[in-house]
């Protein structure tokens, strides 16, 4: 093929791509096709996603008599009440569990994100020998199941004398937060042009100044994405919180709800669902505010 034929081939490919895009838009102009192709799958997805929250809300608002009755509609509340929420807040250590969960999640996320920034920058931008292998090893560390790690971690916790304290969770959560956050930030740092650093080095900037004044401001979406991921994992973590904490006043929400609100074979479903609903609200609110940054950070991390 001659050099003159190359532009014609490129133009032809572009025309074919435009025709395919136009054909796709024309296909969606029909209302029945839009219903089958878009609205119906989206409706099913939204139903499956939101129905557990609806079930938690209705169960938390039902009085005990209605919960135990076989009559009536199980998907609707006939006589709504806030008794379960009152019992949860004023008659159980739930406020302490919530405070413990917030404190542990925020501190563990901060430490993990700080360590991940330095690790990702060193691996991705300093370009030392074996940097790619180091990044791969860090990511593989994330794949190790917590059910295997908690045994040696328990021995370390006992030797340090921090069993049944918040520090036991704050120091163990980064074992699974740092590997993934590092891998995520490595992908996002890779999208930042290296020429910016070269220009800064020529102007006399240090590596610390480059990281703080150039890399981090450009990587805000990636940092928010990694922070949301780390906070969510810390908030929902169960195995370590169940193993390293035994006192009721130090427990987190995921552990406290399922261990303190169940008495033998008696399940207090109203209080259980109220606790689960209140425990899921902070994460849901956080995602609603930062979802654009989360998507942008995840998109930038998987490039290249």
Task: Please annotate each region the language model reported.
Residues 2-31:
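Short, Lys/Arg-rich, polar N-terminal cytosolic tail immediately upstream
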Residues 28-30, 34, 38-304:
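A structural signal for multi-pass alpha-helical bundles of membrane permease subunits
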